Amino acid sequence: MSALGSRETHVLTTIIESYITSAAPVGSRTVSRRSGLALSPASMRNTMSDLTDMGFLEQPHTSAGRIPTPKAFRLYVDALLRQSARRDEAPLHMVEALHGHEPEVGALLRRASNLVSEHARQVSMVLAPGPAEARLRSLDFVPAGEGLVLAVLVLEGGMVRTRLVRDDTHFGSDELVRFGNYINAHYRGHTLSGIRNSIHHELSGGGAQLEAMCAQALALGSLALDSIDDDRELYVNGTRNILDQAEFAELGRMRELMDALEERSRLLELLDRTILEDDVHVTFYPDDVSGGAQRRAPDGLRGCSMVSAPYGGASPLGVIGVIGPVRMDYRKVLPLVGAVSRVLTQLLRERFATG
């Protein structure tokens, strides 16, 4: 907290951490007892008054105590982030909890989301990788009725996508098997985005003259791959933890937050905004959200914050996030999110095209 002197920093940190624990305004006696500073009552009150004047504290009308403002939490969190940036290794128990778990990507991410919600006692979210950067394990074509073919894509990590594509040529079963074998022989282990580009290049005449069978296989493969959208799964856990938070004790406020957590498209947008962050990042709502109506956070998230971190290395695959009241325990949550992010990066980098 370099913007403040050592005394003000110590007092403000004590108030913030007392408020995190109690959810109640913090008085000067509490600060004196917990801070360990040898200040007279008058000096302590003066310091708290100065912090109030600087916008770091506010005083509810019904109490002589103070509560930290979002400005105070931002200063506090930034100091913690600088400390946690020095920790490169994930705690062993986190590694063990996720290593050796289900090999399928969805199961791994569900486990990660559940692990974070259990430890943070907040709502956790994990945005899954899209299929574009997943590596192809196999592509098979199956007749699906008059003029239709079912394309079955199996991707590394256990993701499966099926799509119906038109077949105006009415290929037989044997031909469809040969088409699948050709694509698998040439493109297994490549990313879907890379395969799309290669096939488009070949079909547009950029490659050597293609034999008829090869051209037909690539044309059908192109139809199948172009129909695969980049829709992404979002794994949410721990919504019941909201019930334990004093901020959401009022029924109407709780419903607002629950409604916000059900707005999947908005949550995806909020997580996607943080995917290019270098490491753990904290967003306060609504203070850190700018832009037009299309970029606003759901109203139900007011007074909340999100701790998030991308996973996947230089080319991020997804984001892990924790949503809770601004008063969440950042000393616990920041290293937790960072640790799980690093473990997911280790486990998934072999299955996707990551740096």
From Swiss-Prot:
The keyword Transcription regulation applies. GO terms for molecular function: DNA binding. The keyword Transcription regulation applies. Gene3D superfamilies: 3.30.450.40, Winged helix-like DNA-binding domain superfamily/Winged helix DNA-binding domain. One of its GO terms (biological process) is negative regulation of DNA-templated transcription. InterPro entries: GAF-like_dom_sf, HrcA, HrcA_C, WH-like_DNA-bd_sf, WH_DNA-bd_sf. Keywords: Repressor, Stress response, Transcription, Transcription regulation. NCBIfam families: hrcA. Belongs to the HrcA family. Negative regulator of class I heat shock genes (grpE-dnaK-dnaJ and groELS operons). Prevents heat-shock induction of these operons. This is Heat-inducible transcription repressor HrcA. It comes from Nitratidesulfovibrio vulgaris (strain ATCC 29579 / DSM 644 / CCUG 34227 / NCIMB 8303 / VKM B-1760 / Hildenborough).
